Amino acid sequence: MSHEAVWQHVLEHIRRSITEVEFHTWFERIRPLGIRDGVLELAVPTSFALDWIRRHYAGLIQEALGLLGAQAPRFELRVVPGVVVQEDIFQAAPAEAPRPKLNPKYTFENFVVGPNNSMAHAAAVAVAESPGRAYNPLFIYGGVGLGKTHLMHAVGHSVAKRFPHLRIEYVSTETFTNELINAIREDRMTEFRERYRSVDLLLVDDVQFIAGKERTQEEFFHTFNALYEAHKQIILSSDRPPKDILTLEARLRSRFEWGLITDIQPPDLETRIAILKMNAEQRGLRIPEDALEYIARQVTSNIRELEGALMRAIAFASLNGVELTRAVAAKALSDIFAPRELEADPLEIIRKVADHFGLKPEELTGSGRKKEVVLPRQLAMYLVRELTRASLPEIGQLFGGRDHTTVLYAIQKVQELAESDREVQGLLRTLREACT
């Protein structure tokens, strides 16, 4: 991780811990110079600023570095007169703007497509190519951090590039509600309606928060109608489908269901690894496959947390001057994932089982059907299923590309044996202890 990226993460932590006035006064003009021998070097504009920051914020900076994995968090301040802010440092934590903008990082080019999101991606691409005609509205739902906002912004970028004359508006439901309240209070409803009803593409994030807000629903209902009747594109995101949004007016629910409803599921292992690879490549880093797989196995449901875990591991390695290996990744994430929660390595399970029976791992994963291999292979499949988050198809791939039904049969067979055979019970107990 570059020193700029390390400082960016430090700033994000600091910003959450102090007031905006403090942040703008003391931190906006600090520039990271580099990392030398594990020490983050920072440039400040004056000796007064250096002294003030050292006396009042040193502990906070060290705390932020510690959260990134620095074993002995250290930084050094240096006066560099006329130091200027590098804007990219603050992109991840911008000051509040009067209008939200599309995130330049969220494009189709860096959206990793997998079985969990392929339909949503295809629909988003279709809408970007022909707004107002393909699917209107497009309703994307799924859990937090799975890529809904990424897809919405990607559509916005694509439409802006293809049709530069079109007006695009991205807004969260919370912002829409707050702006509506202010417009009512300040008697600016005509201006408010003009803004949202004159766009060609309206992107509304977290629309589930509109539920229960009568005036907001009323206004959004008329905004929706105006845009839809004018053949303008509407894209909505939510953490649940329309039918599950309680206290949502029936007339809005029915309109949300007029177009295409598509979901995004948590990514599978291969997709998670691909996401991590892309993130690493974008930073010009080459990270060993087993380190990426380790991280991918620890974070299974949330892409935002997955990327955060990667950044933590990269920062940990950078701050401690070591290469990012599987072992380093495990150490970097050890205080996030308690030891009992850390997932066993499937390949290590296979090796342990093979060793116990005096076999080679390739014999368990190969196609051989010798009697002395069958039970150990079934036990290994059972333990991989029990001790990891691997799905049946993923386990099948580990064992020579076997079908998931074969894996299921092996697991059920071991369960049956364990219920009636004390020797198998003891064997499982021994192997389980060896693998965890």
Curated annotation (Swiss-Prot):
Gene Ontology annotations for the cellular component aspect, listed alphabetically: cytoplasm; plasma membrane
Example GO BP: regulation of DNA replication
Keyword Hydrolase appears in the UniProt entry: yes
Keyword Ribonucleoprotein attached: no
PROSITE patterns per UniProt: DNAA (PS01008)
Keywords linked to the UniProt accession: ATP-binding, Cytoplasm, DNA replication, DNA-binding, Hydrolase, Lipid-binding, Nucleotide-binding
Gene3D superfamilies reported in the protein's UniProt record: 1.10.1750.10, 1.10.8.60, 3.30.300.180, P-loop containing nucleotide triphosphate hydrolases
Region Domain I, interacts with DnaA modulators, residue ranges: 1-80
SMART domains, sorted: AAA, Bac_DnaA_C
Temperature-dependence annotation: Optimum temperature is greater than 60 degrees Celsius, at higher temperatures in vitro DNA-binding became unstable.
Main location: cytoplasm
Binding, ATP: 145, 147-149
Family under the similarity heading: Belongs to the DnaA family.
Summary of the function given for this chain in its UniProt record: Plays an essential role in the initiation and regulation of chromosomal replication. ATP-DnaA binds to the origin of replication (oriC) to initiate formation of the DNA replication initiation complex once per cell cycle. Binds the DnaA box (a 9 base pair repeat at the origin) and separates the double-stranded (ds)DNA. Forms a right-handed helical filament on oriC DNA; dsDNA binds to the exterior of the filament while single-stranded (ss)DNA is stabiized in the filament's interior.
Stated name of the protein: Chromosomal replication initiator protein DnaA
Organism for this UniProt entry: Thermus thermophilus (strain ATCC 27634 / DSM 579 / HB8)
Gene name per UniProt: dnaA
